[in-house]
From Swiss-Prot:
Pfam families: DAO. Probably functions as a FAD-dependent oxidoreductase, whose physiological substrate is unknown. Does not display amino-acid oxidase or glycerol-3-phosphate dehydrogenase activities. Is essential for growth of P.aeruginosa in the sputum of cystic fibrosis patients. This is Probable FAD-dependent oxidoreductase PA4991. Its cofactor is FAD. It comes from Pseudomonas aeruginosa (strain ATCC 15692 / DSM 22644 / CIP 104116 / JCM 14847 / LMG 12228 / 1C / PRS 101 / PAO1). Disruption phenotype: Cells lacking this gene show growth defect in natural and synthetic cystic fibrosis sputum. Monomer. Its EC number is 1.-.-.-. InterPro entries: FAD-dep_OxRdtase, FAD/NAD-bd_sf. Keywords: FAD, Flavoprotein, Oxidoreductase. It is an enzyme of class 1 (oxidoreductase). One of its GO terms (molecular function) is FAD binding.
Amino acid sequence: MPQALSTDILIVGGGIAGLWLNARLRRAGYATVLVESASLGGGQSVKSQGIIHGGAKYALHGALTGASEAIADMPRRWRACLGSDGELDLRGVRLLSEAHYLWSPGGLAGSLTSFFASKAVRSRVEQAKGEDLPPALRDKGFKGKAYRLTEIVFDVPDLIRRLAELAGDSLLAGERIEPLREGRELAGLCVDGREIRAQRVVLSAGAGNEALLRELGLEQPAMQRRPLHMVMVKAATLKPLYAHCLGAGPKPRITVTTHPTRDGQSVWYLGGDIAETDGVARDEAAQIAEARRELAKLLPWIDLGQAQWATLRVDRAEPAQSNLLRPDNAFLAEQGRLLVGWPTKLALAPDFADRVCARLEEDGIRPSEHAALPQLPRPPLAEPAWEVAFA
């Protein structure tokens, strides 16, 4: 029988939210164990575009919303971690771009200008022209306008690698997770037959929270899934582009990020409105055809004749909302010794950790003495989606 363990905080779910929380708690002196059933970052995290949103895209058609205000400070907090004064040490993690951009095709430039003239938005953006344009927009055929946002874009696989480093010896690969009770109280979890006692158990497993709650005999908090149908384009002719393209609706028409591949080429990863409801309803062939049409209209000077195409379906797991709306903040619920949450967005991982740390403080949960952990089976790092799709 595997050796029983004792720790302060037991975390289930090794995506960026769980790994970030784990690193924050360890830095604060807590003993932790983080359990992952598959690969680190392999759920939603590694399928993220890596944009640390500051909320500009949520304010595209009117006043700043709750969503844009809640998320406004996130780029500053993440950027601080790349230096010496952040809440975590992410020095050396690869940034794909120092800025994300917003561009409008010719016909919509006027509405974009008036939007960015508003006082609420002015401090977050600046117009880009000439050599300051993203390389993919530096063409005489580009007739629109582009604005540089104060949002950074991380290489997500490299971010996951660094957060796994910060976890030290606290990571545990474990598939079968059952409640460990003392009387009626949750005392910890039994992971593949190994008892792990903890002062608090945190579920941060994204879509996996639903099954974990069921295993613990709980129906609340309820979860919703908002699906996406993303598109990947691989070609030697691609130029770097990290940008939202403005459409007529409240969501970006298309959101493009550029990712290096192991064979020295690049992949454009396409989200935004194309990946939402209509895109979800399309099969792979129809979704690729739609992406081809959109890129031919928006960026006709980019040669995609030899490009490879693939799609990827992703479920965004979140606390249930009325009308399947997008939650504005990270979410955390408490039931006795159990904390359950979703960051709801990559950029809000620090907000999720804030909420857990605040709850521990309120409940008087302090770091305590525990025996050193033995060598534990360690979960692997997730493979980037494009390396799998274009293998």
